[in-house]
Amino acid sequence: MKLSELLNAYSIETEFSNDFEVHALAELNKATPNDISYIDQARYLKLLKDSKAGAVFIRKKESSKVPKRMQALVVDNPHLAFAKASHAFKIPFFKNPESVNEPKHFERVTIMPNVVIGEGVEIGENSLIYPGVVIADGVKIGKNCILYPRVTLYQNTILEDNVTIHAGSVIGGDGFGYAHTALGEHVKIEHVGIVRIQKNVEIGANTAIDRAVFGETLIKEGVKIDNLVQIGHNCVLGEHSIVVSQVGLSGSTTTGRNVVFGGQVGIGGHLHVGEFTQIGGKSAVGKDLPPNTNFAGAIPAMEIHEWHHFLAHLRTNFRKQQKTSLLQKAKGFFKS
């Protein structure tokens, strides 16, 4: 699709000089000359210097930062422009729905009744697929995998060897991503990335792992995930981490290896948890956490102004106590 066709089809108003063939939307640090990216926050401007993107949606006040080799597509709301453009690259669940009725043969694989399989699917030997599983186009499943009843694998999901997924889990569904108009309307961002699950991973029942906006949501080797867990788009879970039930990881959360999330932990988006860190149940995490540490703390919800006062009061009293304790220790030292 030509750039002009893309902009016209989705009513994106901007000027351009080179009407090139657009292949995809991509992250700045992974884009090619035939890709479009966007910048919605100033902290990403530093990525422009080394980016190979052919064009970037950007605000006028920041457009001077765009290298000459790249086109600046000046818009009022880059995130909204990106959301509109993403619809041109939506990948269907089944490209040809009629093909799911065609018989398919896989060597040394057990497939039980009422399994639905799309086109271009690969399944490794000794894998076991239980009734009611749905496998979309382009899915790759390794050796010795087990999919229990009603598991759904969205398009292009990759499971490496020895992956077990329990009943009702959904791998590769849309991430929860929307841009917003000036009137407060929500415009869906089509997620064109995938989920990759590395070897020796086990996932409990009714868990959802969303596919990436672009690139991969990645569950690394040896991770164990409990029932009823939500993992957002573009998350990366480090090797041999453990995620207990009802944990929610917002989009682009990343972790080192052997991290432990207690039940009902909630993580804000775009945060990193260092390796070998453990987080106690019901904790709410709103900042990066260093490696090799333990965290805990759960506060009931309250009105936001009350919460701000509470935090300020708690912090002030805690610091007073620290000072008092230090003074008492100092007095005791001089008396002795």
UniProtKB/Swiss-Prot annotation:
Its EC number is 2.3.1.191. Pfam families: Hexapep (PF00132), LpxD (PF04613). Pathway: Bacterial outer membrane biogenesis; LPS lipid A biosynthesis. GO terms for cellular component: membrane. The active site is at residue 233. Keywords: Acyltransferase, Lipid A biosynthesis, Lipid biosynthesis, Lipid metabolism, Repeat, Transferase. It is an enzyme of class 2 (transferase). One of its GO terms (biological process) is lipid A biosynthetic process. It catalyses: a UDP-3-O-[(3R)-3-hydroxyacyl]-alpha-D-glucosamine + a (3R)-hydroxyacyl-[ACP] = a UDP-2-N,3-O-bis[(3R)-3-hydroxyacyl]-alpha-D-glucosamine + holo-[ACP] + H(+). InterPro entries: Hexapep (IPR001451), LpxD (IPR007691), Trimer_LpxA-like_sf (IPR011004), UDP_GlcNAc_AcTrfase_non-rep (IPR020573). One of its GO terms (molecular function) is N-acyltransferase activity. Homotrimer. NCBIfam families: lipid_A_lpxD, PRK00892.1. Catalyzes the N-acylation of UDP-3-O-acylglucosamine using 3-hydroxyacyl-ACP as the acyl donor. Is involved in the biosynthesis of lipid A, a phosphorylated glycolipid that anchors the lipopolysaccharide to the outer membrane of the cell. Belongs to the transferase hexapeptide repeat family. LpxD subfamily. This is UDP-3-O-acylglucosamine N-acyltransferase. The gene is lpxD.
